[in-house]
Amino acid sequence: MITQAMIENFPPSPGVYLMKSADDTVIYVGKARNLKKRVRSYAGDTRDSRIHIRFMVQLVHSVDYLVTDTEKEALILENTLIKQHRPKYNINLRDDKTYFSLRMDMKEQFPRLSIVRKIPSDGARYFGPYASATAAKEVLKQLYKMFPLRHYPLATCMARKRPCLYHQIKQCSAPCCGLISAAEYAALAHGAALFLEGKNTEVARLYRSKMNLAAEQMRYEDAARYRDLLRAIEVTVERQKMVAQSDDSDVFGLHREADRMQIALLHIRGGTLTGGRSFLFDWELETEEGLASFLNEYYDLDAPIPPQVLIPVPIAEPAALEELLSEKAGKKVTIAVPQRGPKLEMVKLAGKNAETAAQERLARESSSATLLTELAEKLNLPHPPRRIECYDISNIQGEMAVGSRVVFIDGRADKSLYRRYRIKGVLQSDDFAMMREVLSRRFKAESSEEKPDLIVVDGGLGQLGVLNAVLDELEVTGVEAAGLAKSRVARDMESEEIERSDERVFRPGRKNAIALRQSSAPLLLLVRIRDEAHRFAVTYHKDVRSKVLTGSELDGVAGIGEKRKKALLKHFGSLKRVKEATLEELKGAPGMTESAAKALVERLHGSPLPNPPPPGEGAMDRK
């Protein structure tokens, strides 16, 4: 427990404190403006009845501290130590989701919109964020109906001899074939950028003036084009969810249930609600402290930082977090707790989203708990398996072999815990040996990771035997095992009838499979987990095979690494066009040097290509 004697020598300075258990494990990391005052609030003889006091008194054996010069430094150090120690009672926010943005480089000839994950400082304009690639693609799909910009890389477009199919459905203006002037295309690109920024009134004004000008100059086709654009924009704007405040903001709402906190996030960009996210984590301390810790970790995950962050409750030392976020964003960022008006309404809406997400989660957990209890009964497990892992192998006659691991928590896939393995120690086609390697690597290299309650392997008694052998050899305890054999298909050569056997579940110590009704929920869950492991393994195997087969001709060329290789394929559109390119065309590609271009030509063609003869010379040689 924490005593006054422990903190007697703590300084009244900014810093970070580390609470440790009896075995010297860090169980909580916190920051403070005044270390002595903050840690004293946790002391065991206090009359404070808050929930965090009970757990601290029971578990904390010692407290260490690190002094910093400023509160901002304490904030940064706290985040670093949380990542290093991953304390049990801190928020360990591992976000497997990546935000997506739309990119447009206005300096490019005939600018094009593309979906990207990262936002580098390259002078291009970026719009978003969007919580998923699906959301970004939907926005792009609607934009093309209003602003028919080109869809493909410039090199691909310019290589075309006729307009693409998108032009036929009026979603591309075909600049590659000269069907739109550079000035008119620039107006389209400018309008798309304004629209994505939420400046719909400016877009309408821009195109209305261009429509009127075209009509006055009797360019009736152009006038009709702008008229159609205006109509499409008006229809789309009517469908959009608009909010009363126009500042770009992230709006947070929260819902607290005992030791769990649900946070909802709404993204507002250009006055439009562009998307939202929901987060759930265990938290036994004060709500305000949990929110502050969450914000620090969330924006440390390369999440886009808007100029305004709206939160439902005050947090300690907001100025330090504002300073840190402003430094990361390269612009002033404010954190505010709205008291009235439309901003307060948005925070309330985010809170309502958090409460709804919590209610849906409870309903799912109740259903999952029933399902996992039934699964435990059917497989004779000691308790419902909260964490289930499944492994699969994919290869072609032992070549390019890979393994996969998928993880289901409370009956739902947790993709942040998925893992992929390149098989290193097995050269021949031996699925059993490959499975042994994958399982051994999982429990050797990742021994600190949470153990599963149940491991499912894709296979029957053979693969189950491998799993049991690995668990015994590595002395892994408390982990149950099961094998799920795929349905077998047998065709009678004399008839068209197909006989399918049932899915079979095997457990250690049993020679025969466990009889489960084929439509039962427990079996369907196991099949879903097995199929997900198979999908993940096959997808990875295809990626590996694709890199080996298609990337080999560009690999190993002096001066051409992964970055230049990607740039070449993007510029020319395909490996075939790279091989058809002349030395001069290769030298002119983005990021290429003359020496790298010559090395590539030698690799692709065996010797340097001769320079073309000057005009008027070499006629006799060509006869």
Curated annotation (Swiss-Prot):
UniProt keywords (A-Z) are:
Cytoplasm, DNA damage, DNA excision, DNA repair, Excision nuclease, SOS response
The segment(s) forming the GIY-YIG domain are 12-91
Q: Which InterPro entries match?
A: GIY-YIG_endonuc (IPR000305), GIY-YIG_endonuc_sf (IPR035901), GIY-YIG_UvrC_Cho (IPR047296), Hlx-hairpin-Hlx_DNA-bd_motif (IPR003583), RuvA_2-like (IPR010994), UVR_dom (IPR001943), UVR_dom_sf (IPR036876), UvrABC_protein_C (IPR050066)
Q: Could you provide one GO biological process annotation from this protein's UniProt record?
A: nucleotide-excision repair
Domain (UVR): give its ranges.
Answer: 201-236
* Region spans: Disordered: 603-623
Q: Which Cys-Cys disulfides exist here? A: none
**Which cellular compartments is it found in?**
Cytoplasm
Q: Which domain of life does the protein's organism represent?
A: Bacteria
Q: What is its main location?
A: cytoplasm
* Presence of keyword Oxidoreductase: no
The record's section on Gene3D superfamilies has: 5' to 3' exonuclease, C-terminal subdomain, GIY-YIG endonuclease, UvrC, RNAse H endonuclease domain
Under SMART domains, the record lists:
GIYc, HhH1
Q: Per the record's keyword annotation, is DNA repair included, yes or no?
A: yes
Q: Which GO terms describe its cellular component?
A: cytoplasm; excinuclease repair complex
What the entry lists under Pfam families is as follows: GIY-YIG, HHH_5, UVR, UvrC_RNaseH, UvrC_RNaseH_dom
List, in alphabetical order, the Gene Ontology terms for molecular function in this entry. DNA binding; excinuclease ABC activity
Family classification = Belongs to the UvrC family.
Assembly and binders:
Interacts with UvrB in an incision complex.
What does the UniProt function comment say about this protein?
A: The UvrABC repair system catalyzes the recognition and processing of DNA lesions. UvrC both incises the 5' and 3' sides of the lesion. The N-terminal half is responsible for the 3' incision and the C-terminal half is responsible for the 5' incision.
- The protein in question is named UvrABC system protein C
